[in-house]
Amino acid sequence: MTGEAAHHSVSVAGVVIDENGRTLVIQRRDNGHWEAPGGILERDESIIEGLLREVREETGLIVEPVALTGVYKNMRLGVVALVFRCREAGGALTENSEAAGFRWILESEARAIMPEAFAVRILDAYRNDAEPAIRDHDGTKLITPTR
């Protein structure tokens, strides 16, 4: 394949879980959806550098990655997301241009406030499997089972 359709983007997201077992989610300003903080990697940064940058930009928090918990491909947009379970290591929640709001949610609340394709990222981060989940979705719904 040639042209723009042949290219993929890589994104990263951090599922920040606090000492009470709650997950930080942000409400995106661009679409109003709740999801884990994250975004597209820049070409010249490592995966971990991008993760730390994106979480800090969208929340004000400094985090420590604990584990890669999932790899997700948006089949419609060609975006591959690497999602990490993280713990807070500093900083403070800060208003910014990307997040309209913040919430600390329980694992059980994820499906109620976000599309399946994004809720599953939260749920997968709570699993204690040695292997990360590998899933495909259409931007809203899963289209393949977990591995």
Task: Give the positions of each predicted feature.
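Charged phosphate-binding loop/patch that engages nucleotide di/tri-phosphates or the phosphate backbone
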Residues: 123-147
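Conserved Nudix-box catalytic region and its N-terminal flanking loop in Nudix hydrolases
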Residues: 18, 22-57
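Short, solvent-exposed loop/turn elements at beta->coil junctions and helix N-caps
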Residues: 68-74
